[in-house]
Amino acid sequence: YLRWQRELPRIVPFYAVKCNPEPVVLQLLAALGTGFDCASNGEIQTILDMGLSPSRIIYANPCKASSFVRRAASQNVSLTTFDNVDELVKMKRFHPDCKLVLRILTDDSKSVCQLGIKFGAPLKEVPRLLAKARELELDVVGVSFHVGSGCYDPEAFRDAVFRARKAFDMGREHGFIFDLLDIGGGFEHFNFEAIAAVLRSGLAEHFPDEAFAPGGTHVEGKPSGLRIIAEPGRYFVQSAFVLATNIIARRLSAEDEAAESGGAQPEAMYYQNDGTYGAFNCIMFDHQTVQPKVLSVSEQFVYRDDLPAPGVGTAQFELRPCSVWGPTCDSIDCILRMTHLPSALDVGDWLVYENMGAYTLCAASSFNGLSPSKVRFTIGSDASDDAAAVLCLLDSVRRADLC
């Protein structure tokens, strides 16, 4: 969060609840002052149940069920996105006083999870949508975009900001004075500074202070000027969670199997207590690549966080080719068809997977009657000052009014 404040002080983060709705995560981010990007009434209710004001929520789902719109109106959630005429008609009928944000289509080809195939109005459609909103006497207050989840090309944000400015200008032509820009998500840890630099440059070029700061020429009648928000999800939580899995079974390949396959056959198949129907659904739905590190061998702790996978010294342990599987009876429940782990690894030992905080447990199922992995929160032994600050913030959530 402090890194965000340092690099993007002009932009208020609205955490994407869908990414990881663990209560402690939400409480900590609420105490830090973030808003919340909610995609359903259930997520909205989760935030409201924390005692937060509806003003800290954007209902960032352009295509909502009518019943959800009615519920949002009853919950006093008054900011949502749209990208089509039917949604405007729906809003007019069920939530006519809601403030609307037009989601535009951007180039998301440089992202791991591309969303443009499902959401976002092309720029050529913007005039028609704004004309319909004007006809229905609806209040369109701004523009949003999303470059896709897990964006690996910072320049995608520059192009998206350029398109957003085009939509802002179209809004003025239709009598709207927009004062909200929602730059969506797509933020990654490894290139965050590069993305932030592109955003600062793009915003300075297309949304300069002289035009969009309070009193600016493009925000007449808007005392607060242009408000810029974002919807980061994995940026906040991906690296904050690690998943430890227990090896519940092992199947060794017969020597003749390995010989017949020319050595390509895994010498061992390990079965662990979480799989693709659990936290590892991220492999299928979020296109994540995971690599295990060894936590224990022969019930002895061997994990080293300073080494790449498998997290043990090769001089200390002989590695062999193997595969890793989840606990269900479905053959699609495969974590890795080929990796290398210590030959001494046995039933009862543990593996650990880093960067498992985003789009993992939130989509886990109970297939085969199995329960999702439990979450345990720790504060670390080498960050006492940070730990104390976190505990203080969480305590403030429980005691204070955060509205």
What is the predicted function of each stretch?
Residues 1:
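Conserved oxyanion/phosphate-binding beta-strand-loop segments in alpha/beta enzyme cores
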Residues 11-180, 187, 192-193, 202-207, ...:
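Active-site-proximal beta-alpha core segment in soluble small-molecule metabolic enzymes
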Residues 17, 185, 230-232:
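A general secondary-structure junction signal
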Residues 49-52, 73-74, 92-95, 111, ...:
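Solvent-exposed alpha-helices and their adjacent loops that cap or buttress functional pockets
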Residues 53, 122, 222, 398-399:
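Short, solvent-exposed coil/turn linker segments
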Residues 198, 208-218, 227-403:
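Charged (often Lys/Glu-rich) extended helix/loop segments that serve as interaction or gating elements
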